[in-house]
């Protein structure tokens, strides 16, 4: 089976009705398998080469996939998707050219692309890569609406915490081994958390001064606004000073109004904050038209 894009996968799955589909992070699985199969060798005095045993890497990859496939009885025999990242990234093209610019270049394992070419010919997996999308986006599009791809339920399998932002699926978070059941509400919460917190490794800063305290804010949101007063005593008597004061939101004020207010305190406009949210967003089914290859940027 050749490498597919989302449109081809959609057409191939038309009429299917599987109980579930396993949507795996192909980038991560392949990199881990190949890295574990690398070794140094010296073929002549004082000259060393980095090598990769592709047969060993292939076995590690197959064992990893098998271990996840058999994690639960209900997953056995489910179709498997391996998602991969395109060389062009829509976030750089449409949102911010500095996206992931802070990341140090990581050298691919030896023979990486040849290994992928062989993997893409395997019949037992659906290998999918979509123009301009990261593998994460491919996974998000499929998992947020598995019925469009011939399955009643999707399970995301990855070590990346950002998949907490994908709704209507289960997420096997390989870092912890926990299986998270995700709803629209929980996924939206995590997306706003990432928007506020930011992710320096991905090149977006969020709202300055928050970090992990974004969790407390989202659970107990408030409005912060500038209040100007005149000093009535002391050496600066008569001078105006401005302080940012917290208050409870009014009934007509939304969570987004609260987020805008803490952004304003940090010197950000609403569009600045939206830009953070767009970079934090893993695409969902209704945010990408895989027929026309059109991306619908997130807005609150």
UniProtKB/Swiss-Prot annotation:
Pfam families assigned to the protein according to its UniProt record, in alphabetical order: 5_3_exonuc_N
One annotated GO biological process: degradation of host chromosome by virus
Keywords: Bacterial host gene expression shutoff by virus, Degradation of host chromosome by virus, Exonuclease, Host gene expression shutoff by virus, Host-virus interaction, Hydrolase, Nuclease
The protein's enzyme class: hydrolase
Assigned EC number: 3.1.11.3
Reaction(s) catalysed (UniProt annotation): Exonucleolytic cleavage in the 5'- to 3'-direction to yield nucleoside 5'-phosphates
Nuclease recorded as keyword: yes
GO molecular function terms listed in the Swiss-Prot or TrEMBL record: DNA binding; double-stranded DNA 5'-3' DNA exonuclease activity; RNA-DNA hybrid ribonuclease activity
Protein's job: Plays an essential role in phage DNA replication by participating in the removal of DNA-linked RNA primers. Participates also in T7 DNA packaging, host DNA degradation and phage genetic recombination.
Protein name as annotated: Exonuclease
Protein species of origin: Escherichia phage T7
């Amino acid at each position: 089976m050749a490498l597919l894009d989302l449109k081809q996968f959609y057409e191939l799955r038309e009429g299917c009705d599987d109980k579930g589909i396993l949507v795996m992070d192909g980038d991560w699985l392949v990199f881990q398998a190949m890295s574990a199969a690398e070794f140094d060798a010296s073929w002549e005095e004082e000259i060393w080469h980095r090598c990769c045993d592709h047969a060993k890497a292939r076995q590690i990859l197959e064992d990893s996939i098998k271990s996840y496939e058999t994690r639960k009885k209900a997953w056995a025999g489910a179709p498997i998707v391996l998602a991969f990242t395109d060389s062009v990234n829509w976030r750089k093209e449409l949102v911010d050219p500095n996206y992931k610019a802070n990341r140090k270049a990581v050298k691919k394992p030896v023979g990486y692309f040849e290994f992928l070419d062989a993997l893409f010919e395997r019949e037992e997996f659906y290998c999918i890569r979509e123009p301009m999308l990261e593998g994460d986006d491919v996974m998000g599009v499929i998992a947020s609406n598995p019925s469009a791809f011939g399955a009643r339920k999707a399970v995301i399998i990855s070590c990346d915490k950002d998949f907490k932002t994908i709704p209507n699926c289960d997420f096997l978070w390989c870092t912890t081994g926990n299986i998270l059941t995700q709803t629209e509400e929980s996924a939206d919460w995590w997306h706003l958390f990432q928007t506020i917190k930011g992710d320096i490794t991905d090149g977006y800063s969020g709202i300055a001064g928050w970090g992990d305290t974004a969790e407390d804010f989202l659970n107990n949101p408030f409005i912060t606004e500038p209040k100007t007063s005149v000093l009535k005593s002391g050496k600066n008597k008569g001078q105006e000073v401005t302080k940012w004061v917290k208050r409870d939101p009014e009934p007509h004020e939304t969570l987004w109004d609260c987020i805008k207010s803490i952004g304003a305190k940090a010197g950000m406009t609403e569009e600045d904050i939206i830009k953070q949210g767009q970079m934090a967003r893993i695409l969902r089914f209704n945010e990408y038209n895989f027929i026309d290859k059109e991306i619908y940027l997130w807005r609150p």
